[in-house]
Amino acid sequence: MKQPNKAPRANIAAPKGTATPKRRRKTRDELDAEARDRKRQKKHSGNRSGARTNVEGSNKKGHSQTQEKDPRVGSKVPVPLVIESQVKAKSMPKPVEKNVVKPRLTPEEELAKLENDERLDALLDRLDNDEVLNKEDQAYVDLTLDRIDALMEQLGIELGDDEDDVEREEKQEDILQLLKRGNPKDTF
């Protein structure tokens, strides 16, 4: 036996006069119709028939009225079937320059060039004025002076320390004079 439907009760917690609208339950027929519609929509979720082969009708509806290129068609540039004697000069890449060997200077020329180097002169003047050079300048001075020494040795030129030579000669003269005179204490 079926029991009779109960009468809806009012919401006890809500104040009177603010009743919520009553929801109407859907009938079985309405539920079945909605289910059929959902199933129909789900069934047709893919591309329409022929979408893969008919490129014209694909996703670009109404964007432009001009006829768009078919992506399946390749280039329309004619391919020459016979090799002609005159071929268009294609832009040749610039030839890579080989390491150009600079003409070597003779040792005399290189030595003269290094001795007349303005940068070296300026740096040596700064060193004479007791200035401290940075690493790059100091390395340049050291390398250049080492090269000058090597070239002078190669050419057989001795470093002219005139002061040392003069002092040696004076000492020899002094010794000879002392020997000729006798005892140096006697002269005073």
From Swiss-Prot:
Composition bias type Basic and acidic residues, residue spans: 27-37
Pfam family, one: YihI
GO MF term list: GTPase activator activity
One Gene Ontology biological process: ribosome biogenesis
InterPro entries recorded: YihI
Superkingdom of this protein's organism: Bacteria
Skewed-composition ranges (Polar residues): 47-57
Region (Disordered): 1-80, 162-188
Keywords: GTPase activation, Ribosome biogenesis
NCBIfam families, sorted: PRK05244.1-1
Family, similarity comment: Belongs to the YihI family.
Oligomeric and partner information: Interacts with Der.
Functional summary from the UniProt entry: A GTPase-activating protein (GAP) that modifies Der/EngA GTPase function. May play a role in ribosome biogenesis.
Protein name: Der GTPase-activating protein YihI
Source organism per UniProt: Yersinia pestis
